[in-house]
Amino acid sequence: MFKVLPFTAIVHPNAITAPRLVVKMSAIATKNAVESFVVKPPAHPTYDLKGVIQLALSEDAGDIGDVTCKATIPIDMESEAHFLAKEDGIVAGIALAEMIFAEVDPSLKMEWSINDGDKVHKGLKFGKVQGKAHSIVIAERVVLNFMQRMSGIATLTKAMADAAHPATILETRKTAPGLRLVDKWAVLIGGGKNHRMGLFDMVMIKDNHISAAGGVSKALNSVDQYLEQNKLQMGVEVETRTIAEVHEVLEYASQTKTSLTRIMLDNMVVPLSNGDIEVSMLEEAVDLINGRFETEASGNVTLETVHKIGQTGVTYISSGALTHSVKALDISLKIDTELALEVGRRTKRA
């Protein structure tokens, strides 16, 4: 299941001199691990979680590894560290943490009292990792970086998904570069749904496409021709910004066989000076479409406004705030000091 390969970018905790080795899971082992997840990560055609993990470990390790660990921690010291929630929220990233620990040192053992997507309260110890102190400390920051970000996304997603009901909450492509898989996975864990993964899995006709094509109808017609010529089948969404554009889309669809599946209603939620929002334009657009296509509200979506937007009858509500500026959930990983000291004393006596 496992094989040892040379990998110069990642430093194994026990490797002090070159060549450095890292234990890597086989493709079958990776697939089996993913299948066991409570919430499975979304798929991507050109990269996967292994690549994300290896890049994160590589940028941390540099070319010689953790010099502080080598200087301060006996290489054979065994220890135990606990995950502590320092504020209330939804935890996400447990499955990814296990993959990271396994990448650093497959001998590490983990135990959890919760699953991805569960709520934690401040002060709760919800997991522990046991094994070589070197390995735990080397993996610590990478694990926490992912878990804190993912948990922050999942926490906000859960709150917005609950408030948006019966509409479904979606994220956007406004994700951290290189972390789209992870960010979108966190949205799923928090109870949201994924919008398109990238530029390749859905046609999304936005304002710039419409301007370049010469109008909404021309853009839609070009997309229909392109998909037919290339024998492609995928979702098609078009952005509308006014009621007139909604009429134009519906007129086009009534006269032409189209691949259109969803109409985005962009910035049809108007913020008011008193902090409330006006949704009459959005309601009018939803009534016009009358279930012929999926609808997606976008723009001025916050935790405070999403409930009112969700009551208009839209199918989806998309929010870039879920991923582009989310607050990380405060989580720590602390080594059991007494256990470490006792192991250290035994090591010295030996």
Curated annotation (Swiss-Prot):
Enzyme class: transferase
Superkingdom classification of source: Eukaryota
Key words, A-Z: Alkaloid metabolism, Glycosyltransferase, Pyridine nucleotide biosynthesis, Transferase
Record-linked InterPro entries: Aldolase_TIM, NadC, NadC/ModD, Nicotinate_pribotase-like_C, Quinolinate_PRibosylTase_N_sf, Quinolinate_PRibosylTrfase_C, Quinolinate_PRibosylTrfase_N
Matching Gene3D superfamilies: Aldolase class I (3.20.20.70), Quinolinate phosphoribosyl transferase, N-terminal domain (3.90.1170.20)
GO MF annotation: an example: nicotinate-nucleotide diphosphorylase (carboxylating) activity
GO cellular component labels: cytoplasm
Annotated EC: 2.4.2.19
Catalysed reaction, written as an equation: nicotinate beta-D-ribonucleotide + CO2 + diphosphate = quinolinate + 5-phospho-alpha-D-ribose 1-diphosphate + 2 H(+)
Glycosyltransferase as UniProt keyword: yes
A GO biological-process term: NAD biosynthetic process
Annotated positions binding substrate: R141, T172, R173, K174, R196, K206, E239, D266, S298, G299, N300, S319, G320, A321
Keyword Flavoprotein: no
Pathway: Alkaloid biosynthesis; nicotine biosynthesis; Cofactor biosynthesis; NAD(+) biosynthesis; nicotinate D-ribonucleotide from quinolinate: step 1/1
SUPFAM superfamilies assigned: Nicotinate/Quinolinate PRTase C-terminal domain-like, Nicotinate/Quinolinate PRTase N-terminal domain-like
Family according to the record: Belongs to the NadC/ModD family.
NCBIfam families: nadC
PANTHER family: NICOTINATE-NUCLEOTIDE PYROPHOSPHORYLASE [CARBOXYLATING]
Role, per record: Involved in the biosynthesis of pyridine alkaloid natural products, leading mainly to the production of anabasine, anatabine, nicotine and nornicotine, effective deterrents against herbivores with antiparasitic and pesticide properties (neurotoxins); nornicotine serves as the precursor in the synthesis of the carcinogen compound N'-nitrosonornicotine (NNN). Involved in the catabolism of quinolinic acid (QA).
Protein name: Quinolinate phosphoribosyltransferase [decarboxylating] 1b
